[in-house]
Design a protein with these regions (language model features):
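N-terminal basic, Ser/Thr-rich segments that initiate or prime the first beta/alpha elements at protein or domain
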Residues: 1-103, 107-164
Length: 164
């Protein structure tokens, strides 16, 4: 029996959908609201100037995060599926490269959260026999994600074995 050669580590070919930038921005805005509302209440109830400074700092930091980080993420996040493996590159501060050999794929799922539905985006989750966990491809066009899930399912069914 010939030992299998692992797929090479290389940059994945495809970027996520450009609408993912807006998805990440809307998520940052939601975080801003969750953090700012209690600070506004504290400022109104106590009148303490420290709460005003805290609120201003929170707003400035999260607005900067919401404007710049999604653009950086878009430049970095990549994915690719071949007959041999699923490749992903993600992260903006800490970058994560993942390669899941097709022979290890157990399930393929798509997810459409509320903001993703609004923007017609989806996340494809590829569950493998790895202890490291599932491989996620977030920020895909919803139709492209459905086609990717269908194609990946067909590819994995053609590979013999039980993916363990």
């Amino acid at each position: 029996m010939v030992p299998s050669v692992p797929p090479p580590l290389r940059p994945p070919a495809h970027q996520v959908d450009p609408r993912a930038v807006w998805w990440w921005r809307l998520r940052a805005l939601a975080l801003l609201l969750v953090l700012a509302v209690p600070q506004v209440v504290a400022l109104l109830v106590t009148g303490a100037p420290a709460w005003g400074a805290t609120l201003a700092g929170t707003v400035v930091l999260l607005l900067a995060y919401g404007v710049f980080v999604p653009v950086v993420r878009f430049r970095i996040h990549r994915w690719e599926v071949t007959d041999e493996a699923v490749y992903t590159l993600s992260g903006w501060l800490v970058r994560e490269w993942r390669i899941a050999p097709i022979s290890r794929v157990q399930t393929v799922d798509t997810e459409h959260g509320p903001l993703q539905q609004l923007l017609r985006l989806a996340t494809v989750t590829v569950t493998t026999a790895s202890a490291r966990g599932a491989v996620k491809i977030a920020g895909l066009d919803a139709a492209a994600a459905a086609e990717l899930a269908r194609s990946l399912t067909a590819t994995t069914q053609a590979v013999p074995g039980d993916a363990t």
